[in-house]
Amino acid sequence: MNAPVKPSKLIKGATGDWEVVIGLEIHAQVSSNAKLFSGAATAFGGDQNTHVSLVDAAMPGMLPVINEECVRQAIRSGLGLNAKIHLRSVFDRKNYFYPDLPQGYQISQYKSPIVGEGEVVVDLPDGDSITVGIERLHLEQDAGKLLHDQHPTSTFVDLNRSGVALMEIVSKPDLRSSEQAKAYVSKLRTIMRYLGTCDGDMEKGSLRADVNVSVRRPGEPYGTRCEIKNVNSIRFIGQAIEYEARRQIGILEDGGTIDQETRLFDANKGETRSMRSKEEAHDYRYFPDPDLLPLEFTQAYVDDLKAGLPELPDAKKERFVHDFGLSVEDAGVLVSERESAEFYEAVLAQLKDQGRDGKLAANWVINELFGRLNKDGQSIDASPVSAAQLAAIVELIGEGTISGKIAKELFEIVWTEGGDPRTLVEQRGMKQVTDLSAIEKVVDDIVAANPDKVAQVVAKPAMLGWFVGQVMKSSGGKANPQAVNDLLKRKLGL
């Protein structure tokens, strides 16, 4: 159970505080080369109606055949969500009419889903964490796509997406703010990307959310919920929740009642609008699909899949903190995307002394590399600085060959020109000066030239930093800062 909502999370209305209650249904496209019940391709971006089998087009007499890879991916996702795997599940027909649904029904799972209850720990931006319950995960077919812009008076249907396998992941109503909802979706996306069960590409529609929102006075029973369909970005999920909560509060404070309905989010206006009244389960007339046998597998089959799971983000974060002394925040940043965690681990693999340089490597990946990638609008996969090059820079700092200031200059050279960092340091004379006699002359000159500052630093030792800065400036950043600091203290009698 989650802790009571903090007062700061409550929404202030004209007549008092309100609590928003949120549950999410995430539709995640299964990473598979073929559709759920046919051999048609699932690749995004093909010409219209080119990835359509006779099964997908619902031609008479065509029978569905289950794709085992989709079943495996659903089980692996369930295991990644710490959920119960049902060894027997059933496919049902969900009956409704829509032009992009050629069968006149959707093959889904109703009473007996493949995955039961689970939970996900979600870290929040404010440093807190919450546990969000998972109600179920089931497999179902995606529908086709209506095209309204191809003809002035007609709508066309593209069935490329029809029959593509989806995992619908239903949360419990455990979320209490738009920030929590966004963090939850991000965490689910990260887990599935680590598992390789969904690519999480929201721009291509691989991950979509139906957002259920209701409001109530703190401590009162749940209010009437509205469902906002097919929200396709994490930012829009937050905006839709904020608007919908305010809309419902406004109605209730004016003495009205909330209609249970399905709504759409208009991203251009930042508001939701009514689509239709919300259906109940009986409206869909679910019944077991007579063309498909129940799915049955053994516990040994599930155990084999569990044994083959990769290290997931929570475990990886804990290892980074324990083994390399990273802060929880830094470890969280590194594991938030599979690619960034893999890059950091590739840097670690190149280090001779991971205990000494592991934390420094994390700082460089997060601050220097990520900062520059964001500035240039590049992904980590296209980084001009490789893991091996970054590891070499980190080692040069760790062993005292170059200073932090020189390391940033070296990073810039490697970013723009390439090359081996150690060779560049030798060729360009970038080594840190550790010869005390060479540093001592610079120190003596600066002390002699600033008698007024010497008098001040004796009275106010914090001013020592000014002298260190002057020495570093005179040496072009090559002097060893610690050696400079120690030498100045001795010269000034501090």
From Swiss-Prot:
<dbReference type="InterPro" id="IPR042114">
    <property type="entry name" value="GatB_C_1"/>
</dbReference>
<dbReference type="InterPro" id="IPR014746">
    <property type="entry name" value="Gln_synth/guanido_kin_cat_dom"/>
</dbReference>
<dbReference type="Pfam" id="PF02934">
    <property type="entry name" value="GatB_N"/>
</dbReference>
<dbReference type="Pfam" id="PF02637">
    <property type="entry name" value="GatB_Yqey"/>
</dbReference>
<dbReference type="GO" id="GO:0005524">
    <property type="term" value="F:ATP binding"/>
</dbReference>
<dbReference type="InterPro" id="IPR023168">
    <property type="entry name" value="GatB_Yqey_C_2"/>
</dbReference>
<dbReference type="InterPro" id="IPR017959">
    <property type="entry name" value="Asn/Gln-tRNA_amidoTrfase_suB/E"/>
</dbReference>
<comment type="function">
    <text>Allows the formation of correctly charged Asn-tRNA(Asn) or Gln-tRNA(Gln) through the transamidation of misacylated Asp-tRNA(Asn) or Glu-tRNA(Gln) in organisms which lack either or both of asparaginyl-tRNA or glutaminyl-tRNA synthetases. The reaction takes place in the presence of glutamine and ATP through an activated phospho-Asp-tRNA(Asn) or phospho-Glu-tRNA(Gln).</text>
</comment>
<keyword id="KW-0547">Nucleotide-binding</keyword>
<dbReference type="InterPro" id="IPR006075">
    <property type="entry name" value="Asn/Gln-tRNA_Trfase_suB/E_cat"/>
</dbReference>
<dbReference type="InterPro" id="IPR017958">
    <property type="entry name" value="Gln-tRNA_amidoTrfase_suB_CS"/>
</dbReference>
<dbReference type="InterPro" id="IPR003789">
    <property type="entry name" value="Asn/Gln_tRNA_amidoTrase-B-like"/>
</dbReference>
<comment type="subunit">
    <text>Heterotrimer of A, B and C subunits.</text>
</comment>
<comment type="similarity">
    <text>Belongs to the GatB/GatE family. GatB subfamily.</text>
</comment>
<dbReference type="InterPro" id="IPR018027">
    <property type="entry name" value="Asn/Gln_amidotransferase"/>
</dbReference>
<dbReference type="GO" id="GO:0070681">
    <property type="term" value="P:glutaminyl-tRNAGln biosynthesis via transamidation"/>
</dbReference>
<dbReference type="GO" id="GO:0006412">
    <property type="term" value="P:translation"/>
</dbReference>
<dbReference type="InterPro" id="IPR004413">
    <property type="entry name" value="GatB"/>
</dbReference>
<dbReference type="GO" id="GO:0050566">
    <property type="term" value="F:asparaginyl-tRNA synthase (glutamine-hydrolyzing) activity"/>
</dbReference>
<keyword id="KW-0067">ATP-binding</keyword>
<protein>
    <recommendedName>
        <fullName>Aspartyl/glutamyl-tRNA(Asn/Gln) amidotransferase subunit B</fullName>
        <ecNumber>6.3.5.-</ecNumber>
    </recommendedName>
</protein>
<keyword id="KW-0648">Protein biosynthesis</keyword>
<keyword id="KW-0436">Ligase</keyword>
<dbReference type="GO" id="GO:0050567">
    <property type="term" value="F:glutaminyl-tRNA synthase (glutamine-hydrolyzing) activity"/>
</dbReference>
